[in-house]
């Protein structure tokens, strides 16, 4: 019983780590996207 509990705990930890990485990637992509839009608009003027 304790083995399975420990396994679930480690799985949850790795999932949270993956989620943090995904959020970090999304934030970085969003910032790059905003910069690109800003530069494109700047070219239009």
Curated annotation (Swiss-Prot):
GO terms for cellular component: plasma membrane. It is a single-pass membrane protein. InterPro entries: DVL (IPR012552). It is found in: Cell membrane. Pfam families: DVL. The chain crosses the membrane at residues 22-39. Its main location: membrane. Keywords: Cell membrane, Developmental protein, Membrane, Transmembrane, Transmembrane helix. Residues 13-44 are annotated as: Required for DVL/RTFL small polypeptide activity. One of its GO terms (biological process) is shoot system development. Small polypeptide acting as a regulatory molecule which coordinates cellular responses required for differentiation, growth and development, probably by restricting polar cell proliferation in lateral organs and coordinating socket cell recruitment and differentiation at trichome sites. Belongs to the DVL/RTFL small polypeptides family. This is Small polypeptide DEVIL 23. The gene is DVL23.
């Amino acid at each position: 019983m304790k083995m399975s509990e420990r396994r679930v705990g480690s799985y949850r930890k790795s999932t949270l780590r993956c989620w943090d990485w995904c959020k970090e990637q999304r934030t970085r992509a969003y910032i790059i996207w905003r910069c690109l839009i800003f530069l494109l608009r700047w070219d239009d003027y």
